């Protein structure tokens, strides 16, 4: 499919883990320039959050990512407040994550919905997304990917196997 893209477009192969990303790279051997292979987190950081976060939200201080327990929260607005006031991009607490919520995906979706330049950028840059291990996606990830398809017209190719789900608790 990478040969069918316009010269400005890319195809993204997205997976859950760095190991799976490396496996895909090894299998492809000769990766075309218009193919991006990354984890879901890395894709969201590089393509949506870092380039467009400050267009959507006013940040009082430079952004830093944190997975420390002391910064975890259970509410989207609390997470946004932490980003805007302290520059700390943290994650939901375990109880909230178990409900199928993923703060990074929710922020990325919010940016795409409310920041036209972000949605236009993604729509024109990526023709297709190949999502591996889709069975491990939580509800927030699913919502984000379905938005990319329905609202931005990005084609999705989803690969998953319920029997291999390692994150069934995610919802």
Question: PLM features: residue spans?
Answer:
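Short, glycine/acidic-enriched loop or turn micro-motifs at the edges of active sites
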Residues: 42, 135, 164
